[in-house]
Amino acid sequence: MADAITYADLRFVKVPLKNSASNHLGQDCEAYEDGELTYENVQVSPVPGGPPGLASPALADKAGVGSEQPTATWSSVNSSALRQIPRCPTVCLQYFLLGLLVSCLMLGVAVICLGVRYLQVSRQFQEGTRIWEATNSSLQQQLREKISQLGQKEVELQKARKELISSQDTLQEKQRTHEDAEQQLQACQAERAKTKENLKTEEERRRDLDQRLTSTRETLRRFFSDSSDTCCPCGWIPYQERCFYISHTLGSLEESQKYCTSLSSKLAAFDEPSKYYYEVSLPSGLEELLDRSKSYWIQMSKKWRQDSDSQSRHCVRIKTYYQKWERTISKCAELHPCICESEAFRFPDGINLN
């Protein structure tokens, strides 16, 4: 009771199913690579031990092959396909290697180009670095110079500020001095106005004094008959620009001299007549006022001064003798009144009483 067995040999081929076997075998590697997977029934030789010539009717119907088509046709087609299939991977490998070689060449060319470009860029970078260093050095030098200049400018600025502050202080001091001067000027102007008022007042007083002086001069004119422009103190007797004063106080010669000195005068001296040295010529106004009963101390004459002995032991006084006044010698310690003499003085500003 053995059953019949049909064997199917399945082969997977990336070839589109064509009606013509020649078209299938003539496709290039690209069609081979881009095809779809299909299944194809292949006639195999019968298995040993099995009944020859047996085949499944279903398989024969699927293959679409008539019973009258010989089996040898499938065998030849299968053999030709099997011979053509191994050639496609070799061609692809060659193309792959060729593409890989081209890629390597292109990569090498790119590497060389990149190397050349790198060298160019490196040289440019070095050149740029040198230029940058030179520029940086120049800029640093310029910066140092600018910093030095700025330092000098700062010193000059500080000096200028100090000078400005000093000038401002000087200006303020000058302004204060100017203000003080203005205040002093105002004070001087006020003082000037006040002085003008005082001067005006003094002028009025001077005119009043002139009037009073004129009145006084007219009053004094009554008491003086001398026509000279000199005068003597009140109580003194004027005579030829001299003033005489009669003292009624008794005293020695020395005391009389001191008394006359206290009156800013001296003992009177009278000229001697040419005939008699003892005679005395007295002014008429003075002689009338003398007391004839008394003697008066006077200054020693020139002739009597020549005798030093008589000067040291005796002094001169005058007295009346037979109605005339004569000089006589007496002891200096005797007590007698005296006659003082002084220079007459002029009126102020040369004013004459006449």
From Swiss-Prot:
Keywords carried by this UniProt record: Disulfide bond, Glycoprotein, Lectin, Membrane, Phosphoprotein, Receptor, Signal-anchor, Transmembrane, Transmembrane helix
Record bears the keyword Ribonucleoprotein: no
Membrane topology: Single-pass type II membrane protein
Post-translation changes: Phosphorylated upon engagement of the B-cell receptor, probably by LYN or SYK. Phosphorylation at Tyr-7 is important for interaction with PTPN6/SHP-1.
GO CC annotation terms, alphabetical: plasma membrane
Segments on the Cytoplasmic face: 1-95
Bilayer-spanning residue ranges: 96-116
Tagged with keyword Iron: no
Disulfide bond sites: 232-243, 260-340, 315-332
Main subcellular location: membrane
Residues bearing glycans: 136
Extracellular side: 117-354
Modified sites of kind Phosphotyrosine: 7, 39
Expression across tissues: Pre-B-cells and B-cells but not terminally differentiated plasma cells.
Disruption phenotype: Cd72 deficiency affects the development and the functional activation of B-cells. The most prominent effects on B-cell development are visible at the transition from the immature to mature B-cell stage.
InterPro entries associated with the record: C-type_lectin-like, C-type_lectin-like/link_sf, CD72, CTDL_fold
Domain C-type lectin: 231-342
GO molecular function, one term: carbohydrate binding
Cited function: Co-receptor of B cell receptor (BCR) that plays both positive and negative roles on B-cell functions. Recognizes the Sm/ribonucleoprotein (RNP) self-antigen ligand, and coligation of CD72 and BCR inhibits BCR signaling. Mechanistically, ligand binding leads to the recruitment of PTPN6/SHP-1 to the BCR complex which is inhibitory to BCR signaling. Acts also as a ligand for CD5 and thereby plays a critical role in maintaining regulatory T and B-cell homeostasis.
Subunit text: Homodimer; disulfide-linked. Associates with CD5. Interacts (tyrosine phosphorylated) with PTPN6/SHP-1.
Name used for this protein in its record: B-cell differentiation antigen CD72
Source organism (scientific name): Mus musculus (Mouse)
